[in-house]
Amino acid sequence: MIRRLHDTNDLVRAFPRVHFVGIGGTGMSGIAEVMLTLGYEVSGSDNADNVATRRLASLGARIMRGHSAANVLGTDCVVVSSAIREDNPELMEARSQRIPIMPRAAMLAELMRFRRGIAVAGTHGKTTTTSLTAAVLSEGGLDPTFVIGGQLLAAGANAKLGGGQWLVAEADESDGSFLRLNPLMSIITNIDADHLENYGNDFARVQAAFAEFLQRLPFYGLAVLCIDDPEVAALAARTPRHVMSYGMSPQADVRAENVVQEGSRMRFTLRLPQGTSQEVVLALPGRHNVLNALAAAAVGWQLGVAPDAIARALEGFAGVGRRFNDLGEVTTASGAKVRIIDDYGHHPSELEAVFAAARGGWADKRLVVAFQPHRYSRTRDQFDKFAAVLSSVDALVLSEVYPAGEEPIAGADSHALARAIRARGRSEPVVVGKAAELASVLPDVLQDGDLLLMMGAGDIGAVATHIAVEGFKGEGEA
């Protein structure tokens, strides 16, 4: 049946039921929450229960554990994440019933039709930059909609339907899906070699994808680009769109000067166009987070947010889940008191930035790292860089690679990585199996006063939270 549509409410009434396959993912759950708030009847399936699925259920979504063809019956549209296999029973049933199927990024693009889109891309820093941008626009009274790949701690959610005209969202380059978006403003934080398996193991194709991403801006759109990153600077020089640059470079349109780290905060002078300046205290550690804040400040300034409002947003920022989260101090059975930091970093560049932030704020402490490598392909592709950066810490415990659906690759596991680190002669890494084993092994490595970084994109975050709440008890201990 062909239904006549006149406005957004007509769309909801005509096609009210939307089903998400893999609804527990960070990107999927955020879109689902926005659509719930818009008035859609949202259902979804996932193999595991998590914070996101529980939140969606509390908001009225119907959540199913596991995947079944019956889950999609009666729905008007099926949204799928890139992690869903082609033989998924729900996807196959949707095809057989000729139910429209939308990739996650395509549905995000549909939401952008009803707002003015700001897309945040880059190999590293997307989640924090998106969150900071949403915070700046909110402080400026613009009430944005946001869809973030992590939990914005102040909101207790990774998405919100705002009343304003702007939508701020992460643009995922990992599988090229960011090329489905048509924003009015695009941020690129940096361009690095990651997810090469989706680009034919050819970095030139990654570079070309980011160039095409900017080409999707309208002629009146704006590219907000970090020229401290050489790849982004090269792209800025040749992109045929309006550019606002940011960074610590003297040539940047929006820049930070007099940058000083004070524990878990950064203090700097924010230089804006037209000779405007503002003293800023950023409630996040590390020079990489200063760059993330500059991107948010650039967008805020462009949209008329006052400099003092930008500063208030940055100082009051409560953080994002698993991005240098200070979980507090825990005492081992032997009496050693250690501070635990939980972080999502899983690429050598991210590890290096987090290590620098930790040493900048706690230079007097021993830096102990528990790291769970993520994906065999990334471990293989970045093997030498991982070995180099992990060799720089005072003590290291590695859990086995979190496969994320990949099959093992010879020479790309944690034991091989430990051998490479050991050969450098600077540390003696300890290797465990599952991340859950870290709770019982770490006390033998830790000393009083240590700073413990627990890092990785797999399930190590749950282990960090368990230790912070329950102490250093092995899995299954009372």
Swiss-Prot record:
This is UDP-N-acetylmuramate--L-alanine ligase. ATP binds at G122, T123, H124, G125, K126, T127, T128. GO terms for molecular function: ATP binding; UDP-N-acetylmuramate-L-alanine ligase activity. Belongs to the MurCDEF family. It catalyses: UDP-N-acetyl-alpha-D-muramate + L-alanine + ATP = UDP-N-acetyl-alpha-D-muramoyl-L-alanine + ADP + phosphate + H(+). GO terms for biological process: cell division; cell wall organization; peptidoglycan biosynthetic process; regulation of cell shape. Pathway: Cell wall biogenesis; peptidoglycan biosynthesis. Cell wall formation. It is an enzyme of class 6 (ligase). Pfam families: Mur_ligase (PF01225), Mur_ligase_C (PF02875), Mur_ligase_M (PF08245). The keyword rRNA processing does not apply. InterPro entries: Mur-like_cat_sf, Mur_ligase_C, Mur_ligase_C_dom_sf, Mur_ligase_cen, Mur_ligase_N, MurCDEF_pg_biosynth, UDP-N-AcMur_Ala_ligase_MurC. Keywords: ATP-binding, Cell cycle, Cell division, Cell shape, Cell wall biogenesis/degradation, Cytoplasm, Ligase, Nucleotide-binding, Peptidoglycan synthesis. It is found in: Cytoplasm.
